[in-house]
Amino acid sequence: MTSTYHDLYLKIRMSLSSAGIEAAQLEAREILCAASGKTAEELYRDISLYTTEAIAEQALALQERRLAGEPIAYLVGEWSFCGLPFYVSPAALIPRVDTEMLAQLAMNRLKEHQGSTRVLDLCAGTGCVGLTVAALMKNTRAVLVDLSDGALDLCKRNIRRHKLTGRAVYLKGDALQPPSHALGQFDVLVCNPPYIPTGDLAGLDASVKGFEPMMALDGGADGLDFYRGITSLWQPALKPGGHLLYEVGIGQAEQVAWLLVKAGYENIRITRDTGGIDRVVEGQRPKEQEIPDLLHETLEEEG
């Protein structure tokens, strides 16, 4: 027997709330929107109308998946980042509010450069950081690099979603290998790499370790493998005077900052997030002093 959208909403909200889900009201709405194909505005407009049996069945199926621990973002297939919608899937991490600071700081640094600019989003995942920068800065071109085919498919879809096909591209690449000369150089390199120590993965929340990709989480024994590799190998991809910005995990900021110091970066900064946690570490490639081109050295050694 069918029920109204309002009755179905109340039923789902009560089930989620009883399971201890804090944002039960928001998530019940998201589930109904996903099941019905309606926007939030359309759902409010039609809230007193009757649903179809198919919509009710789909909504209750999504509810059960949520009760089993699956993140709401994966259930609905998209999530908001810096006020922009992005397609998501279990192939990439869900965009998080903490990471919005990385995008904002990247835009701040790009404003220091004259004319058209280029941003490289390494370990791009959904592409949310690089594409947010490109969407909000009309003179910026973005290159999104990831090793995961599933993540690259999300990048492709999100480029199209935000009508950025003329200013953004996605490429398959390994952050722990030297960059290709074909990439050219960038004004800003942003990266939210895997940074969870391997030994801590088992202790992650079930909604994370059970659904989000391990390759996007595992940062090696101390969580710093990607910071070491990228800091040394990807220097040639930055223009002199260009900025490298990392998101970091709790307690990692000083160690990552020291990696940048040892690599010759200047103007090292650590920025805290809204929770008071050191979240972004950045450094600037010197404008005059040449940093050793480790890519050339690597190629010469191989030759």
Model-derived regions: residue spans:
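Mobile active-site "lid"/loop adjacent to the S-adenosyl-L-methionine
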Residues: 195-226
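Flexible, glycine-/basic-rich loop-and-beta segments that form/coincide
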Residues: 286-303
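Conserved SAM/SAH cofactor-binding pocket of Class I
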Residues: 100-203
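Helix-to-beta-strand junctions that scaffold the AdoMet/dcAdoMet cofactor pocket
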Residues: 164, 212, 238-240
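Conserved Class I SAM-dependent methyltransferase catalytic core
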Residues: 221-285
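Conserved AdoMet
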Residues: 32-109
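Conserved hydrophobic residues forming the short capping helix/wall of the S-adenosyl-L-methionine
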Residues: 16, 110, 159, 234, ...
